[in-house]
Amino acid sequence: TGTVGDTTVRAGGALAPGNSIGTLRVAGDLVFEPGSRFEVEADPDGTASDRVVVSGTADIRGGAVLHVGPEGGFEARQRYVILTAGQRRGQFDAVGSGYAYLAPALSYDATSVALILQRRGAPGSGDLAFADLADTANQRATARAVETLPAAHPVYRAIETLPEGAPPAAFDALSGEVHASTRSALLTGARQAQRVN
């Protein structure tokens, strides 16, 4: 957050516009050299994200990497404008993330770069299903049940934005909750049936 003059992010360097959503203003030109990084976060309670606003030209040279991490607070299918400039040249060679189910994609126009997280593709088929990253039959059953929830449901959203490696443990935790809730419901139903008799 703040304002700087002409800026060049060199190989091994990183540009992060702010801590907990910030806007960095560049009064002049911004250059991302090969091997540099651009790190962005988003507000999980809204549509705001880190952003760089360049008054001159944003020159994105080959090799630059945009990193988006699960700790960044991004929502799936939400479009975030992360860079605006008087003019934009070049593109990021890669965009990386640590999400298990979501892959970031970038869109460019003459003056901006936007980011959207989309469901990763499964080999030979459509989207990666929640069950594709489950290890056991119980985890797969739980994953399939979660996938039937609306995309706006908090449990669905929590699973969809898990970091890599986390889904099996999350499904184990959820299956325990499901069994406990089912058991409680069955016990309540049995008690009510006994009262009727």
Question: Which residues fall in each region the model found?
Answer:
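Outer-membrane translocation/initiation segment of Type V secreted surface proteins
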Residues: 70-197
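Extracellular beta-strand/loop-rich repeat segments of large surface/secreted proteins
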Residues: 1-81, 87
